[in-house]
Amino acid sequence: NTLLQVSDVIKTFGEVIALNGVSFNIKSGEVVGLVGSNGAGKTTLLRLMSGVYYPTSGNVTLGDGTPVHKMRGDLGVVPESTGLYSRLTAWENIRYHSRLYGIDDAVAWKRTLKFAQSLDMEENLSRYTKGFSRGMRQKTALLRALAHGPKVLLLDEPTAGLDITSARTVRALVEQIKQEGGTVVYSTHQLFEAQQVCDRIIIIHNGVVKADGSPAKLIEETNSDSLEEAYVSLTQEKARMRFEDIKS
């Protein structure tokens, strides 16, 4: 069951080609990692998938063919910059966002409380976000993205700048969502994190998909001893592997 489809997408900014011929599907229940170095195109791709950017050519659609920008309520987005209102409490930030999608406050609160328990954020929901640490702001952004019940959660470097404990908590939440049948797209440049969290990894290099498959298959198909070695091999060579060739 395909929830999100990226088809032959090219995205340019002036003469700069940020993404070049990117295609893949996201299926229900998958946790998919977008892995690449800084500037590889991960954030641009996530902004296209969330409907913030429009492709120069190609399409980004939901499974039924609807362009993503017309159905943003199906998506929960945690950008690299959390964009919280500092004069509002954590819950007020979450509630404001949920109301934009027509979600009843009681429904949003129930969802928020469920995940706040997992993130150890229950006691912080009534606090103003102005004094929040990076980790607390990131957790609030996660709760905000989940409160309206999205079909797909899009995370842009969700553990960047977090301490070890906060990063583990975020990864544990992704695992919880996965166990409950949720669908997550997880951008990271941390290979160990992608291997730990994701069922499937899409390696992006210079705006091109270099590989798409499970961590084990990427290692196997490159005759590597580790995912790090496989990544180096794939991004240094011009070989391109498609998911059709690397089936998990």
Where are these regions (language model features)?
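ABC ATPase "signature
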Residues: 212-213
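Conserved ABC transporter NBD signature motif
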Residues: 57-71
